[in-house]
Amino acid sequence: MEVRKLTSTDGFIAFDLGDAPAVGVVRLAPKVLRDGAELLARSTTYAAASFGLQVGGGSAGLNAKPEGRDEAVAAFVAEVGELVESGRWLPGPGTGIEPDDLAGL
């Protein structure tokens, strides 16, 4: 398990299989727990494997209060763009995130 701390906002991304391509969700709340993100990344790996997909799980957590939500999401999108463009990670919306929030990716 690799956990990357974000530098532009209070958050992190948990990748279950190191450098393997990953899929998973982005969650936003006042306090997203790292342990929960790691478990979600691991379960996403197993779910993908059950469908014969050769990808790992990746789960992001953004810690932001409602008044700082938009700024946190914008910073996150700007910071992880390279991971998405390179094919390293395919994120989807989870709790607290709308599909339009990730449109810039």
Report each predicted region and the residues it spans.
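N-terminal ligand-binding/catalytic initiation module
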Residues: 1-105
